[in-house]
Amino acid sequence: MTNPSEALSEKRDVVLLGASIGFYWKFEDLPKRMGMEGYTFEYIGEDGFDKSKTLQKILSRPNRPDAIFLKQCAAYFPGDLVQYQALMKTYVQECLKAGIVPILVTVAPVREPGIFKLQYWKNIVKKIIYPSRPTVEARLRDLTAYNDWLKKYSLEQNLEIVDLEKALRISDTDRRLRADFDGGDGLHLNSNAYAKLDQIVMPTLEKVDWNRFIRVRGQTSTID
C-alpha cells in the first residue's frame, strides 16, 4: 500500500467495498485465479447503501489502498436515487482527496426466479401477504436507472467503471440477469457469473492513469 507522500509502488493494493457479491466472489483470490501479478485484492463488506463510515475507516489507514471499487447491491433497490447519487459523488470526492483511485461498479441485474425454483413461489406468497413489497420489475427499473446515471457520471468525470450489468444481462434491450448466471433466487449469482466477472477486472485496471491520482493526493479535488 502507499503512504500519502509516496508514489505508487509496483505492487498495487485494491479494495472492493461492497456487499454479498464481493463475499461470494472471493475477490481477494482474484489475482491468483487470473494470474494478475503485481496486485493484492481485499474485500470489505458493508450492508446498506450508505458505506460512508466504512469508507472513512479505509481512508484513515496509515497505508491506504491504491484503488477502491465502489460496489452496491441490487437488494438496495428500489430506493432514493437522488440520495444514492449524492452518496456516490461523496465517496468519489473522498477517494480523490486521499489520492486513491475510485473505480465505479454498476449494480448486477436481477430476474424473476424460474417457475421451478422455490424462490419463485415464495415471491408470489410475499406479494399476497405484503402487497406493498417491491417487485422484481421495480428493482430492475431502479437499478438500471442508477447504472445509466453511474455510466454517464464516469464519463463526465473521466473515471473507470466495471460494468457488471453489461457482463451479466441478457442483452442491451433485455437488461434482466441471464438465467445461466442466476444463483437460484434471481438476486444472487452463481459460479458461472463470478467466473465471467473475473474477466472484466484486469482490463479496467489496465486503463487507470495511476499518475493522475498521485497528483491529487492530499489536494482538494475539483470533481463534482
Task: State where each predicted segment sits.
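Conserved SGNH/GDSL esterase-like catalytic core that processes O-acyl groups on lipids
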Residues: T2-A86
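Short beta-alpha junction loops
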Residues: G99-I100, T106-E112
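N-terminal secretory targeting modules
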Residues: M1-L17, I21-M36, K97, P113-F116, ...
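Catalytic His-Asp segment of secreted/periplasmic serine-dependent ester chemistry enzymes
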Residues: L17, Q119-D224
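Serine-dependent acyl-ester chemistry module
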Residues: K57-L59, A67-V82, V110-T144
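A short helix->loop->beta-strand "cap" motif at the edges of active sites that frequently abuts
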Residues: K97-P102, L159
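A cross-family glycoside hydrolase active-site/sugar-binding cleft signature
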Residues: K71, V105-V107, E165
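Generic structural signal for well-ordered alpha-helices
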Residues: M88-V92, N147
